[in-house]
């Protein structure tokens, strides 16, 4: 999900509400509308975060979060969804896990997230498939009816075995009209199989279906937005990665608006993407506004919208938290830097005049501004990439969003999975 804006990811909540229509889809749409009773405050949790970052499911501040999107599952060309890290996903034994359990049991993040769900009944967990690295096989997986059915079946198998509440598809990105059409068919198949599973094993429960969607026009202009708005519960708009090592000049990472007086600093902006999604047929209340919990750095620069030389990793004592040019929010601002605000673009950045390093990132004030913006347009809530990078306490971006949003969605998660392959999930960890 952390994508360069050639990728510009945007997850948007989308269920086209044509309430005047008497079609079965409109009826289903109305019932889904009633299920969410407040704003979404969603966060991506990465399975690789349990290693060097040492961020475990128990570290989530669950009271601030409505949806945890567990990333990522891989997929094969025939649509088969597979674990990309079996140890992290369901094998790792945590301190309170016994090595003497009888039967077949899930461990790893699957069990830990189920424990979080049990303790926080308003928190839903979704299984995310793809991402920037693992999107290669989506065109093939979506290209035939057989592959689409296989994708849906294998995705739902993991979902019910691990005790999750829905599926998130992160295809980066459909490249043409054919792929965009096949994406819709793929999502319709997943929706159909989710509903069939619910009818048999969880009557009355609605499993969620979401996507990550791009904020870059070159990518979202290819999508069938109105169709996505009908089949999905949420479209999470990845409204970040607007500038970085791929950019010719320094710029804002996640600005709300363009700045006509400094266009080099705002090659992209969130407002244009949001308005285009709505014009394209996505109901505003299904759009979830993505926000970054990281900053992008530029070195040897005089300021925003100007030339730079490097982003880190090439000397000068600056690299990044985990990769060159990308800093966890909890490491910012760096010592010696002062925070600047572009009041036109609505974007913050830090600048150190001595080292000539600029880092664009969201602050708590920026989150408050973005939440006010999304509320003004009737959007569905906030989404964050990703959980391990946040600060604790009053400066948490996720927590700031919760406080600014006010009433979060409290619809209950599901704890009953009678046909999970794992004894402990099937028994509700009892």
Curated annotation (Swiss-Prot):
Domain called GH18: residue spans: 39-408
Biotech use: The antagonistic activity of Trichoderma harzianum is used for the control of several soil borne plant pathogenic fungi.
CDD domains, per the entry: GH18_chitinase
The enzyme's E.C. designation: 3.2.1.14
Protein name: Endochitinase 46
Maturation-removed propeptide residues: 23-35
Signal peptide bounds: 1-22
GO annotation, biological process: chitin catabolic process; polysaccharide catabolic process
Molecular function per GO: chitin binding; endochitinase activity
Sugar-bearing residue positions: 219
Record's keyword terms, sorted: Carbohydrate metabolism, Chitin degradation, Chitin-binding, Cleavage on pair of basic residues, Glycoprotein, Glycosidase, Hydrolase, Polysaccharide degradation, Secreted, Signal, Zymogen
């Amino acid at each position: 999900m952390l994508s360069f804006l050639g990728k510009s990811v945007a997850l948007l909540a989308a269920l086209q509400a044509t309430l005047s229509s008497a079609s079965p889809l409109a009826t289903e749409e109305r019932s889904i509308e009633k299920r969410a009773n407040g704003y979404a405050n969603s966060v991506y949790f990465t399975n690789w975060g349990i290693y060097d970052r040492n961020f475990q499911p128990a570290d989530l501040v669950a009271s601030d979060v409505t949806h945890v999107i567990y990333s990522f599952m891989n997929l094969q060309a025939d649509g088969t969804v597979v674990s990309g890290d079996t140890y992290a996903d369901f094998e790792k034994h945590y301190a309170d896990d016994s090595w003497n359990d009888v039967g077949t049991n899930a461990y790893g993040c699957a069990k830990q997230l189920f424990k979080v769900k049990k303790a926080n009944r308003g928190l839903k967990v979704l299984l995310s498939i793809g991402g920037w690295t693992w999107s290669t096989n989506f065109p093939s997986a979506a290209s035939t009816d057989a592959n689409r059915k296989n994708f849906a079946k294998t995705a739902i198998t993991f979902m019910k075995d691990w005790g999750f509440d829905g599926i998130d598809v992160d295809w980066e990105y459909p490249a043409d009209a054919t792929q965009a059409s096949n994406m819709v068919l793929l999502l319709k198949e997943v929706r159909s199989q989710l509903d069939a599973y619910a009818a048999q094993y969880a009557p009355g429960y609605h499993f969620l279906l979401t996507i990550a969607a791009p904020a870059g026009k070159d990518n979202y202009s290819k999508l069938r937005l109105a169709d996505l708005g009908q089949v999905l519960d949420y479209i999470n708009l990845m409204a970040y990665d607007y500038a970085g090592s791929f950019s010719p000049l320094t710029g804002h990472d996640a600005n709300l608006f363009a700045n006509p007086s400094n266009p080099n600093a705002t090659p992209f902006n969130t407002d244009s993407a949001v308005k285009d999604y709505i014009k394209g047929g996505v109901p505003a209340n299904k759009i979830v506004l993505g926000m970054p919990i990281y900053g992008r750095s530029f070195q040897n620069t005089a300021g925003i919208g100007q030339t730079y030389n490097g982003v880190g990793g090439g000397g000068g004592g600056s690299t990044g938290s985990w990769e060159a040019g990308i800093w966890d929010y909890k490491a910012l601002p760096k010592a010696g830097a002062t925070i600047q605000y572009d009041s036109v673009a609505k974007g913050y950045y830090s600048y150190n005049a001595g080292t000539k390093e600029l880092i664009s990132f969201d602050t708590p004030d920026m989150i408050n501004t973005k939440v006010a913006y999304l509320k003004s347009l009737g959007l569905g809530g906030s989404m964050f990439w990703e959980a391990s990078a946040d600060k604790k306490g009053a400066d948490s971006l996720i927590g700031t969003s919760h406080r600014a949003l006010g009433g979060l969605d409290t619809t209950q998660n599901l704890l009953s999975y009678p046909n999970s392959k794992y004894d402990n999930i099937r028994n509700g960890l009892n």
